[in-house]
A protein has these predicted regions:
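Non-transmembrane, solvent-exposed regions of membrane trafficking/translocation machinery
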Residues: 1-140
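Residue-level signal for pocket-adjacent positions within structured domains
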Residues: 135, 147, 184
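Juxtamembrane "pre-transmembrane" interface segments
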Residues: 159-192
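A mature extracytoplasmic/lumenal domain signature
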Residues: 104-106, 156, 181
């Protein structure tokens, strides 16, 4: 597509309204990111979305990677770092699907309650990011989550749930996971 070369590099996700804006092959990621970060493209964003960071997810079984637009702040600092996660483990939800249980310290629990309330009200998502890769971007299904204990459910298999628990536990390591509010809608995050 010569009139819009970006559209030839991005495939529309099968599920509209989710956190993934589009999918692209890993070979095209740098070019897509370059296009999306051009000043003339960034200028087109409404002022409320001025601080947007373009991030990619993990490659799927078809060799495609999800594109996310993550809302940040002027300092590009995440509202929560993985250091607030005191425990995370793979579990199973009420319907016996793989899930991740997570517990935060008291400081993290307070911020988490505010983030989850906002995500619930705005029907947006919360991205879990490690080394600028989005590992999960669940939505909030039942309102603010207080107390810092949460269960992350979604369309992932057992190995993906184990990986996500490991990413959340990585907060104790130098390369900690960041938890960032995103402005899109998708899979679900509920109170355990």
């Amino acid at each position: 597509n010569l009139s819009n070369p970006l559209l030839s590099l991005i495939k529309t996700p099968a599920f509209q309204g989710g956190p993934v804006l589009g999918n692209s092959s890993q070979n095209d990621q740098d070019l897509v990111s370059l296009y999306l970060n051009l000043p003339e493209v960034r200028q087109l964003l409404p002022s409320a979305n001025r601080y947007i960071k373009i991030l990619w997810g993990k490659e799927d079984e078809n060799g495609l990677t999800g594109l996310y637009a993550i809302k940040t702040n002027r300092q590009d600092a995440p509202p929560l770092s993985g250091g607030v996660v005191v425990d995370a483990s793979q579990s199973f939800d009420a319907t016996n699907n793989p899930a991740v249980s997570m517990q935060m310290n008291s400081q993290g629990a307070k911020v988490w309650e505010v983030l989850t309330e906002r995500a619930y009200r705005q029907q947006s998502n919360i991205a879990i990011v490690l080394d600028d890769v989005v590992y999960s971007a669940p939505g909030v299904s039942r309102g603010a989550i207080s107390g810092g204990r949460s269960e992350i459910t979604g369309d992932f298999d057992l190995n993906e749930a184990i990986d996500l628990a490991n990413v959340l536990r990585a907060g104790k390591l130098p390369a900690s996971a960041d938890i960032i509010q995103s402005e899109v809608v998708g899979p679900s995050l509920g109170q355990e």
